[in-house]
Amino acid sequence: MQLSALALATLLATANAHFTVYYPGWRGDSHPTQTQGPCGGLNKIGERFKVNGKSVDVLLKTSHTSAITEYRLCLGDDCGTKSGSDGQKDFSKVLYGPINELGAGNFCMPGLPLGDLKDGQKGTIQVIMQAVDGNLYNCIDFEVDNSVDAFNAVCKNSTGVSAEAISNANAGSLAENTQGSGNSSGHAHGSSGSGSASASKTDSKSSAASGSASATSAAASSAASSAAASASATEEKNSGSLAYVNGALAIGGVVAAALLI
């Protein structure tokens, strides 16, 4: 039996896809080399986007139907300028994850916590997505400007896009396989999902939030369960994105229960 051209194209786009950082922006177009860590094969600092020093919304566009996703941080002027494991050493701090991102389209991580950074501080956020085609990498170079709003209205999920916590996840697992060489030019650039940031509700299938590796505890798990139950009861009344942020349940970009900072 032969596959139709449409079916084959769909299969390739699903099996070998990439992701883009819509907001605040990425180091550069990494599609040809996105399998190369730590920054998708881009070893030169790009445009530094202005972000609030406490938290930042991150909006991704992905064509994967499922991808384990993790966010990491490096502070400094030259983060991620080396290839492979040498460059990955810069990103030792896990901001959030890993979580399981579900559905193709726009995926918003609201209120990604940066701590309490001061004006003028520079750094880079690394996003790793692990899907059927292996690890994919992108980096966000930034400079802190605390006059910038921490929340952005464009950061909303596409219809059908959601995220779920991963119980007992190893926050360092995605970074361990960072490659410094390789060529992903054979990957198809999938385009499924809405290109606009249309609002939708995000389901949460887990009552336990997967916070940063250094902030897991029985008390936090219990509190996260309570937050998830509360959110479930009011889900129909809320619109916008729903995601676990640093152990807290966030709806429409607003942290509902800040459990782990």
UniProtKB/Swiss-Prot annotation:
Signal peptide region: 1-17
Region (Disordered): 174-210
Record InterPro entries: BIM1-like (IPR046936), BIM1-like_dom (IPR046530)
Keywords: Cell membrane, Copper, Disulfide bond, Glycoprotein, GPI-anchor, Lipoprotein, Membrane, Metal-binding, Signal
Pro-peptide positions on chain: 239-261
An MF annotation (GO) of this entry: metal ion binding
Record bears the keyword Signal: yes
Cofactor descriptive note: Binds 1 copper ion per subunit.
Disulfide bonds: C39-C139, C108-C155
Superkingdom of origin organism: Eukaryota
A Gene Ontology cellular-component term: plasma membrane
Subcellular location: Cell membrane
UniProt-annotated binding residues for Cu(2+): H18, H64, D133
Transcription regulation among keywords: no
Residue numbers with lipid attached (GPI-anchor amidated asparagine): N238
Record's compositionally biased regions (Low complexity): 180-210
Pfam families per the UniProt record, alphabetical: BIM1-like_dom (PF20238)
PANTHER family in UniProt: COPPER ACQUISITION FACTOR BIM1-LIKE DOMAIN-CONTAINING PROTEIN, HYPHAL ANASTAMOSIS-7 PROTEIN
Physiological role: Lytic polysaccharide monooxygenase-like protein that has diverged to biological functions other than polysaccharide degradation since it does not perform oxidative cleavage of polysaccharides. Acts as a cell surface-bound protein that functions in the copper-accumulation pathway.
Family listed: Belongs to the X325 family.
Protein name per UniProt: Lytic polysaccharide monooxygenase-like protein X325
Species whose genome carries this gene: Yarrowia lipolytica (strain CLIB 122 / E 150)
